[in-house]
């Protein structure tokens, strides 16, 4: 009798990339990155340079939100609007700095990893993606594009 093991590794389009070629790719890349973060480490492709840069955004999240682990554990991830409002208590929507934009991405990626599933995302980890999309706009994507490259 042989054991049946899953060998599926989630590997999004931008995971192995070193940089983005167009501002139009930022939203898609960030969406893939948060989704990728929802998988267990052994079930996702190793990060290339671009995703390594995105992983470093967790440092910005620590600077802005202080204790992101406790924040992630205690936020109501089943309610996207409430999570966005909590983040807005730290970071108002008007004219976010590059560190604040990075911190939002880092916080949501941390939440996706914390609440993620073994071989697929959970509803809470997907909501971390929706929170990020709720918080960022086209101006933010333009700003973060420069940091990602």
UniProtKB/Swiss-Prot annotation:
Result of altering residue 35 to E: Disrupts self-association
Any one GO biological process: symbiont-mediated suppression of host NF-kappaB cascade
Pfam families given in the database record: Poxv_Bcl-2-like
One cellular component (GO) term of this entry: cytoplasm
Disulfide bond entries: none
Record-level Gene Ontology MF annotations: molecular sequestering activity
Keywords: Early protein, Host-virus interaction, Inhibition of host NF-kappa-B by virus
Domain of life: Viruses
Quaternary structure note: Homodimers. Interacts with host IKBKB; this interaction inhibits host NF-kappa-B activation.
The protein's role, per its UniProt record: Contributes to virulence by binding to the host IKBKB subunit of the IKK complex and preventing host NF-kappa-B activation in response to pro-inflammatory stimuli such as TNF-alpha or IL1B. Mechanistically, sterically hinders the direct contact between the kinase domains of IKBKB in the IKK complex containing IKBKB, CHUK/IKKA and NEMO.
Family assignment from sequence similarity: Belongs to the orthopoxvirus OPG200 family.
Identification of the protein by name: Protein OPG200
Protein encoded by which gene: OPG200
